[in-house]
Design a protein with these regions (language model features):
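Structural alpha/beta core scaffold segments of enzyme domains
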Residues: 1-173
Length: 173
């Protein structure tokens, strides 16, 4: 169970804040189910292309991603989250990521669970499986060989503290 995060933009919060300020009292606003569905939009369509290279021994050396996410009629797709997560769990020295926020003649898109991340992760993990198979390395071992760990620099700059990626993969053995 659980809501797993909000599914729509917060339209009520600013209205409640203004009403509370004007009245001097707390204000609670609740949408019914119909209003909640009408205030959101569809999840964004996406096109994800991932290329990865590794040595014959299985060490990832380079990766490239092209991410195009539909935003609907106005900019605002979750392509930024996709770009941050596409190679986040791997230690790859050479990375290029192109992310496009595409406006199209459709309703605005909105967030659902892990907006932007799942699309990118699926592209990466599919390629990782294919690469491991081509190299004759068991996929879990391939992931362990290349897992991000403390000190790994993510493609968009931050250096990881201890994140537990290796420990999770080892527990899966």
């Amino acid at each position: 169970g659980g809501g797993f995060g909000g599914k729509f933009a917060a339209y009520l919060d600013p209205v409640a804040a203004i009403l509370s300020k004007k009245t001097g009292h707390p204000v609670k606003m609740v949408m019914n189910r119909t209003e909640a569905f009408e205030s959101t939009g569809p999840t964004p369509g996406s096109y994800v292309k991932v290329k990865m290279g590794a040595t014959n021994e299985g060490k990832l050396t380079a990766a490239q991603a092209y991410l195009a996410y539909e935003a609907g009629a106005f900019p605002g797709s979750p392509v930024g989250a996709g770009a941050m997560t596409v190679f986040a769990v791997y230690d790859i020295p050479n990375v290029v990521i192109d992310g496009l926020d595409i406006t199209v003649n459709k309703p605005k898109t909105d967030a659902y669970r892990a907006p932007g991340a799942t699309n990118a992760a699926y592209g990466t993990e599919t390629v990782v499986d294919e690469l491991a198979e081509r190299l004759g390395i068991e996929p879990l071992e391939f992931r362990l060989m290349n897992a991000a760990k403390e000190g790994t620099r993510r493609a968009d700059g931050p250096v990881y503290p201890r994140i537990g990626c290796v420990e999770v993969l080892e527990a899966m053995r």
